[in-house]
Amino acid sequence: MGYLVRKADAFLREWKKNPDRKPLIIKGARQVGKTETIRTFARENYKNVIEINFITEPSYKVIVEEGFSAEHIIKLISRIDPTKHFEENETLIFFDEIQDFPEIATALKFFKENGKYDVICSGSLLGVQYQRIASISVGYKTDYQMYSMDFEEFLWAKGYSEEAISDMLCHMLEGVAFSEAEQVIFSNLFLEYCILGGMPAIVSSYIERETFEGSLDLQHQLLVDYENDIVKYAQGLDKAKILSVYRSIPAQLAKENKKFQYSKVSKGGRSKDYMGCVEWLKDAGLINVCECLQFPELPLKGNVDESKYKVYISDTGILVASLDDESQIDLRANKNLGIYKGALYENFVAEALVKQGYGLYYYSKDNSTLEEDFFIRSANELIPVEVKANTNRAKSMRQLIKSDTYTDIKHGIKLMAGNVGISENIVTFPYFCTFLLKRYMGKQNLFQ
């Protein structure tokens, strides 16, 4: 199928409208769609596009040998390939896979000062060495974090209009349940998205074929590619330990207590044995880390128990690819999430919150039954968010709302495989509405 519309498209258009725009660095994990998005934008907006990939074209690493000025770099690019034409104010220079040549970031200052050519850089695993890139280009670049497709982008790919999405938000704002037909349709679409994840190549293949056939092979290959990246780029750390941590995540999430435990990585494993591994995976964009609050109250920063956290895979489709063969067959044949239902729903919600710009926080105490899956905040409140694989009553949430101790909590949000509803101070939304939470929070009156 053709190009899949992405939210990054609108960001790129706004970036180009800015007369004082800086060179742009687009970060994101492998295969989230960075290169195709940039290429499409470039074709539609520039007369000349100079694309250099530092993995497939390592010969271009010499372009800084005479210095980092825009003039020197343009001259050497032209010497390597005289067919590349540089026309002032009509040319985009696209440096791809810069994780293999972070030195190019030094040139961004000089391209900004030159002002005659637009520059976009992109790469995977940039977070791993981003301090270095950031320090040599501070003040002369704009950063943009790109993720795999969220559920809204999946709906666009399936042909759904902005009108349909606006109608979903109206149901949330007005507290009106979806019709039975709508509920079934959107729930089925949501299950498709959960099984596939948001990697554009996988989504595109599924829509073209109208079947899950082949999707698991693509997911498995991506999982292999991620693990190969760990081996290639994990410098200064024990690569085997990082791999072990990454491979343990599905089992960690399958536990009733989803707190990350190093004893589940290896027998007798301790946090000091795996120092830096979780941080590396987070910086690489492969996982999302949910921090445990010491107390369910504001502020969030400075209120974290650093010894406790949960770890989620950054794309739920990659988590699905890690499941056992029997579950894979059942998922694709019957859309049955089985014993992994709780893990997949929770991973999806974590992923959706991150893609909306929220930090991840939860609450749990070893000597208490009081616990919450996630928290988000409004202007005046801390809002607990519960992920319910079944229809239980959210006892912890009600206890927090009624508590005289935790006065920052007055309302709650429950996400489940049900319909829209309001009961006392708790609003309930179906999982397929999760991507709209930030817009809901910005427009509703309940939490103001």
Task: Pin down the residues of each PLM region.
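Short glycine-rich substrate-engagement loop in P-loop NTPases that contacts/grips substrate
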Residues: T56-N89
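Accessory nucleic acid-recognition modules appended to NTPase machines
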Residues: S204-E371, F375-A379
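Interdomain motor-coupling "hinge/lid" segment immediately C-terminal to the ATP-binding subdomain
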Residues: Q131-A254
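N-terminal pre-Walker A segment at the start of P-loop NTPase domains
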Residues: M1-K17
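Catalytic cores of nucleic-acid endonucleases
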Residues: A389-F429
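Conserved lysine of the Walker
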Residues: K34
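Structural recognition of the conserved hydrophobic beta-strand(s) that form the central parallel beta-sheet
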Residues: F94, D118-S124, Q145
